[in-house]
Amino acid sequence: TGIELVQDCKEKGYGLLATGEMGIGNTTTSSAVTAALLQCEAEEVTGRGAGLTDQGLTRKQQVVRTALETYDLWHADAFTVLQTVGGLDIAGLTGMCIGGALWHIPIVLDGVISMAAALVAERLFPGVREYLLPSHLGKEPAAVKLADALRLFPVIHAEMALGEGTGAVMMFTLLDMAMSIYGQSATFSEIAVEQYKR
């Protein structure tokens, strides 16, 4: 499970983990999860994924809406939503988010699918979000809504629609640069400069 994966990584000495996924159709499942948990319409959160035509997008939105209505997911708890319309990828990523909190390892979220999993985790165990670092804000319309709901705001705005952990890995480089600046930059007192006051 995702929780066990994080535990294993902790035991091996890892201090930071990235999420990512690979698959076809998983923006459909993440849209359904998002719409259910945020109680919004399918059309508000369902985008083109890997590049659907207008006809394909309309069909995808209909599929999401039908699932929400058929299983009355707007009134369901997070676990029911996950088991009804979330895929194995979203379940595993949800476990990683929970595992990050359990084992005190920050988890760098990739895109919209990871963020949908993060919202499930936060709804199941409030406070999990404190261990999550969002990497990029993708092209899917659910991305902004998920960031707002989680109060986690991605720093990379590159209109990516890739998945597979690409945004999360890019975030590692930014984190390395930030840590380098933090660790190697001189302080005002070290260079005898009066500190700015606001």
Where are the predicted features?
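N-terminal loops that bind phosphate or other acidic moieties
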Residues: 1-198
